[in-house]
């Protein structure tokens, strides 16, 4: 196996379980020294269990890699600074940041409490900002000091934010924000030698089984299919690639990944247009026919149900 990350230092948030765990392990397999960040909370963000990160560190060390645990919370600005500083203090630098940490508190909008909204936004969106900010400060300072920089940020968005999903207004809003954040920071950091991309993974984790029991049966059935398309291990190769020097020049992109399938996501763009013949503003009463004609011309939206049907078809293959 060609090792793509020799000499690199990576930080992975939420690396104690699920997708983050597999990302941390494969980054280490490819030669990266890894900061395994995870405070060990429940899927809804309560509690703290340091063994979750410790066990991943031990697994990496047993296979001959280098890793250190960090238990800070990403939604705390100073805590996020300590996460990044752990990489610098322990391994001398940071090359790769994988923003993976997340929780779920799914509720319909009329049942959602302020705390449910605030906490999910804080962990996903603010947490991504916090860690990204501190890493980018370090990279910018390195670049301004004349030192070479080849930074990589891989954020984690979701179809819930790109397509929408009932019961996840907090989570979807955070994930949509992360997609936009990715595009903007990619432009801001390009001149400093940093690329910024995002993945929208679908895999079997606590967040897709324990937190969303309506999906649990479907996801578990795939585990016993001829091809386990929802194994979280399937997500890590894309992260390793985007973290490597081979991905140079690829930035500001969002990729959905499920098993052996990868999509390049297009994002918001105009799909239909109307302009009045006269140079005058629209009148409200004339807009009904105009808007409805435009809607007929627009391509159909993807839905999460369509994606899941494709996943199940591939699993049964």
Where are these predicted regions, by residue range?
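Residue(s) in the substrate-gating loop at a strand-loop-helix junction
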Residues: 158
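Canonical Rossmann dinucleotide-binding motif of NAD(H)/NADP(H)-dependent dehydrogenases/reductases
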Residues: 3-36
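Active-site helix of classical SDR
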Residues: 132, 174
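The beta1-alpha1 cofactor-binding region of Rossmann-like NAD(H)/NADP(H)-dependent oxidoreductases
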Residues: 50, 54, 71-84, 114
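C-terminal helical subdomain
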Residues: 220-316
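Substrate-binding pocket helix/loop in short-chain dehydrogenase/reductase
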Residues: 108-109, 116-121
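A glycine-rich helix->loop->beta "capping" turn
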Residues: 63-66, 79, 86-99, 105, ...
